[in-house]
Regions:
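Composition- and surface-driven signal marking solvent-exposed, interaction-prone regions
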Residues: 27-33, 43-46, 124-126, 137-139
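Short loop/turn motifs that connect adjacent beta-strands in outer-membrane beta-barrel proteins
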Residues: 22-26, 52-64, 117-123, 166-174
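Feature captures outer-membrane beta-barrel proteins of Gram-negative bacteria and organelles
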Residues: 12-20, 36-58, 67-69, 109-113, ...
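Transmembrane beta-strand segments of outer-membrane beta-barrel domains in Gram-negative
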Residues: 1-8, 15, 71-73, 77-175
């Protein structure tokens, strides 16, 4: 895919993923992207192990997998709220220039399990480092208005869910 933004300039991206046709337990996906303006490579890699044998993807019901991912990319502050990938052809079109962006390093470990009775557990651990880029600055709220070079966060999450009798619809395709 070819897109553009304030920091990357013209951006070239190539993505790929495996399915259960390669291995019914191990799944890999990722991308590499290069910006002509900042001349930096960006990338993401994800490895998922499904504890149950999958027909096509690791997120088939009932899910039971562990996943690890690492990403280095440039993002606008709003990109983390997107339900889809920021390089989606419809999201990549902007009506105004977004010049406040950041380089993000994000390492995530995720576990998810669903049962046939409607109970599910999801756990997540994340370490993230945001370094401002473009016209974005992180400024400490002190008298000197100190410029902060980056913001590093760590996050843990646990979700328990019980939805007895829940039904799912899916589209089945011959692949």
């Amino acid at each position: 895919m070819i897109s553009s933004n304030y920091v990357d300039g013209t951006r070239f991206r190539l993505s790929g993923m495996t399915t259960a046709k390669l291995n019914p337990h191990w799944f890999f996906n990722g991308y590499g992207a290069y910006g002509l303006k900042d001349k930096k490579w960006k990338y993401e890699g994800n490895v998922t192990y499904s504890f149950r044998k999958c027909e096509f993807f690791p997120w088939e019901f009932p899910k039971h997998y562990i996943s690890a991912s690492y990403r280095y990319d440039v993002m606008s502050p709003m990109d983390k709220f997107l339900d889809t990938d920021k390089d989606n052809v419809f999201v990549a079109w902007k009506t105004t220039t977004v010049d406040q962006m950041s380089y993000v390093r994000d390492a995530t470990l995720r576990y998810e399990m669903e049962t046939l009775s409607g109970f599910s557990v999801a756990a997540m651990a994340r370490h993230r480092k945001d370094t401002p880029a473009g016209k974005l600055q992180y400024i400490r709220n002190d008298a000197a208005k100190t410029i902060v070079p980056d913001i590093t966060t760590a996050e843990l999450g646990l979700t328990l869910r019980y939805a007895p009798g829940e039904t799912f619809g899916s589209i089945v395709t011959d692949v």
